[in-house]
Regions:
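Hydrophobic, small-residue-rich transmembrane alpha-helices and their short perimembrane loops
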Residues: 1-315, 319, 325, 336
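Eukaryotic, compositionally biased intrinsically disordered regions
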Residues: 331-335
């Protein structure tokens, strides 16, 4: 996938420059409808399997839903690959816009501070991913404790004589999804601002390059690895041959695969897809602050660039900030 992505970037740039890269990103975004359909397939099959098991339907029903869910995990990994590739192309286009507005002619990795920024940028996706996975684990344990409490304090749940307090479990997941994402979101927003205003636009360019490269690799790896772990767990439903011996559900290898899936699910559903958001958000924040940290001039340099007006072989030069305030007759008169 990385070689294909690199080839797409090189060919797009060769034929139409950075504009071609932007068009390539737009072209990949054109597959959004297909990606949504692919991503929706897996959760639907997974929910169908859960309903079949809770309803105590025949085992062949659960077997069919497991097969569908395994296919869903594979298609979801494919769809996430498209998403991360389009995010990489979009980030590259935003990066080019940042370089232009910030007035950078080149980013020299021989400079120690730029190289340091490159390393810091490469580290950010790992921190972001760790925080996301940790948040999932904390929320899951809170929900497990709540379920245990309900079994302990509300008699008759398993005999269908009492109704569980579903809303409390929903509240736990909702609250965790908001509160636990404050720190990862703050990292994506604050780091570009902090680096840009303290170290300058060239170092910030190094950070963005590191985030993009590391984030794309992490996103593809986590989406594929998470789907593989999930499918490995499901394969024990029919039996897995390990060194000539068949192992089924509730065996020791199956228990190990369940443990692996507790990492795989956050990989493929949380931290993997979040890499798309991270690399695009940091590029957008950098683009927003670019005029304020530009190499040439102050924060309003974009409107202070000289504009030359030519009328009847004569010309006049004034700043864009002044030019946009004048109407056409005034500009013509001024030029004359």
């Amino acid at each position: 996938p990385i070689i294909t992505l690199a080839a797409g970037i090189i060919l797009s740039y060769k034929f139409a420059g950075l504009y071609g890269v932007s068009i390539a990103a737009a072209g990949m975004m054109a597959t959004t409808a297909m990606q949504l359909a692919i991503d929706a397939f897996g959760p639907i099959a997974d929910n169908a399997g859960g309903i079949a098991e809770m309803s105590q339907l025949p085992s062949e029903v659960r077997g069919r839903t497991d097969n569908l869910d395994a296919v869903g995990n594979t298609t979801a990994a494919t769809g996430k690959g498209f998403a991360i590739a389009s995010a990489a192309l979009t980030s590259l286009a935003l990066f080019a816009a940042f370089v232009g507005i910030a007035g950078i002619t080149q980013i020299d990795i021989y400079k120690a501070d730029v190289l340091a920024g490159l390393f810091v940028g490469g580290m950010i996706p790992f921190i972001f991913s760790a925080l996301c996975i940790s948040a999932v684990g904390k929320a899951a344990m809170e929900m497990v404790n709540e379920v245990r409490r309900q079994f302990r304090e509300i008699p008759g749940i398993m005999e269908y004589k009492a109704e569980p307090e579903y809303e409390k479990c929903v509240a736990i997941s909702t609250e965790a999804s908001i509160k636990q994402m404050i720190l990862p979101g703050a990292i994506a927003l604050i780091v570009p601002v902090l680096v840009g205003f303290t170290m300058g636009p060239e170092v910030l360019g190094g950070v963005l390059a590191g985030v993009t490269v590391s984030g794309v690799l992490m996103g593809i790896f986590q989406s594929n690895a998470g789907g593989a772990w999930d499918n490995a767990k499901k394969s024990f439903e029919k039996g897995v041959n390990i060194d000539g011996q068949m192992y089924y559900k509730k065996s020791e290898p199956h228990k190990a695969s369940v443990t692996g899936d507790t990492v795989g699910d956050p990989f493929k559903d949380t931290s993997g897809p979040s890499m798309n958001i991270l690399i695009k958000l940091m590029s957008i924040v950098s683009l927003v602050i670019a005029p304020y940290i530009a190499v040439k001039g102050d924060h309003s340099h974009a409107t202070k660039a000289p504009v030359e007006i030519k009328v009847e072989n004569q010309s006049a030069s004034l700043t864009k900030a002044t030019a946009i305030k004048l109407d056409k007759p005034t500009l013509t008169s001024l030029s004359k």
